[in-house]
Amino acid sequence: MKKSIISLLSLVSAMLMTIPAGAQITGVELARKSQDPNQLLTHENDKVIREIEADADIIVCGGGLSGVCAAVSAARHGSQVILIQDRPMLGGNASSEMRMGIVGVKEDQCQEAGILEEMQCRNFYYNPLQRYTLWDDVIYSTVVEEPNIRLFLNTSVEDVVMDGEKIAAVKCWNSNNYTKYTISGRLFLDCTGDGILRLSGAEYRRGTEAKSTYGESYLSNEKDNFNTMGNSILLQLRKTDEHHPFTAPDWAYHFTDDDFNYDTPKSTIPGIKLNYKIIWRAHDNNFWWMECSGVKFDTIHDANEIQYEMKRIAYGVWEYMKNHPDGRAKDYDLDWIGSIPAKRESTRYVAPYTLTQDDVVSGGHFEDVVAYGGWTLDDHNPNGFMNKGLASTEYIVNQGYGIPYDCLYSVNVPNLMFAGRDISTSHMAFSGIRVMATCALIGQAVGTAADMIIDKGTTPAGLRKDYISELQDVLEDDDCMLPYRWRKVSPLTLSAKTAAENEPMRNGIDREWEGEDNGVYAAPGEVNLTYTWEKPVAVSNVRFIFDSDLKVRGKRMRKLEATTERVPMPSEMVKAFKVQVRVPADTRKQRKLNAADPAAGEWKTVAEVKDNFRRLVKLSFDLVQTDAVRIVVDETWGAEKAHIFAFDVK
């Protein structure tokens, strides 16, 4: 307990120390410089609304998981980034405001990694009780630890400034600090979901295409329509020892059994899963099926009306379940109810390519693949909660279907890219790629691409033409698996000698796959994970993939938050380790002892890590001439041996 408290305090302390680098603090400093501390401010000498200008290479609009991953990936590769978020916390639908579970691929071997997995393991480390408000700050820490990111919270994009066909700047408003911002950049990434940068004139779609538009057999509508999936307000429950009846507000709906006669699970069809309202159990229920109609309401412009309607539904549902005579929810109390509806669907930009049902069903074999999905084609009924019967229909698809780069940049605004649920897809394909783990992968891909565009002085279209293979290599090196290919291992790693049992560390497959382990085990203190060369080589970087147990589904936040059970770190992950190099002895001693003799050199520690919680670890150190490199595991997170998927040297 004491250690966890210290870790949490360290997290908060690190956050507070990092804040002064942010653009909002810059605004405060500017205001302080312009006022006399000994002068009373009045209507004659005070400015009610400040106006501040800022600029960066890359402007990311939207601080959900796709925006966070885009900003962090671009910043880590060297670009100057501004991240704009209209809420007081990051995370979007995954934040404490909305509490939607992070889902994506359903198959163990295809589970998402990259920055998303890093944040989820960080959450285990700092937030083992899985409290949502602390999860907000875990995401926050991931962002503010990056020196190349300036974060603008509570800041809404209101307009754009155009320079011909390109976006030159965004106009923003922060009602929290009464400040107007003009934020300029070279590239603009729309990760808002609703597509606010449509203000630029970028082409987009809203609604559902006709079945014939892309030949999508899972659709039934013969004509285009404005129907979308609806928004949801979620509930969280608390286990209780006593039953106390629940009284909903007078303005809530009041339901009876007659309202749910059609909501009984029925047999499924092969390849199709039929989902109904889960009104018969309280345990393990996050109430995703409480959904406001995307037919009756516009999910963007009717947001206030949807909020009220969803509150009426949510209170009414809980009153019905809690007080039901069969006692289905008697052991639970309502612990939390959302206030902001989480959105599923609104806007989809138009890119050079539009992902469709057939692309998903066939596996998404694209030359320019940069991300992947694995959620079913999960098309929610547009009538939402008030539909009598089905809540959603899931069409089962192959796991790990590819998502191409050509879906991720505007067809008519040359410096606009996008990530998350506003990328270029049909409505049916969207029903699978909209979930947050997939959106996070897309965000990391777009952020990495954006940095490369800045670095090479090209455009999104130019990157597709000239550098797509390089982008794919960088993504794989950053622990983003891509379908139908494996990571390229560095030539220096492949040129080394190592024991036969160590070969999986350099096969480029950084996870269990098709029944193959693809890893090695090492007990603390063992020195057998070693690469050697006949002649000294120059080494300054190492890369590891440790086992974070991608199979564990418990990384998503709990549906019952009030539990006191702590979530442990993945036991086979390396907690502490050293990287050591062997410095060759002088030439005469080598000739005397034989250069192949391990005693002919001295082992030197060039890097040491403690309390590691990352799956991907990259370390740099001063360039050294060496004929051997090894990792020495000092400690695991509980297992007798650590499990390591990759060990690369450069």
Walk through the language-model features, giving the residues of each:
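Predominantly extracellular/luminal regions of secreted and cell-surface proteins
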Residues: 489-511
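N-terminal Rossmann-fold NAD(P) dinucleotide-binding loop
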Residues: 67
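Flavin (FAD/FMN)-binding glycine-rich loop and adjacent Rossmann-like elements that form
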Residues: 25, 29-39, 45, 169, ...
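Bacterial N-terminal signal peptides
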Residues: 9-20
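Beta1/beta-strand and adjacent pyrophosphate-binding region of the FAD-binding site
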Residues: 50-64
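Bacterial N-terminal signal peptides that target proteins for export
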Residues: 1-9
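Conserved N-terminal/central alpha/beta ligand/cofactor-binding core
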Residues: 26-37, 47, 55, 73, ...
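Aromatic, loop-rich ligand-recognition surfaces of beta-strand-rich domains
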Residues: 512-600, 605, 610-650
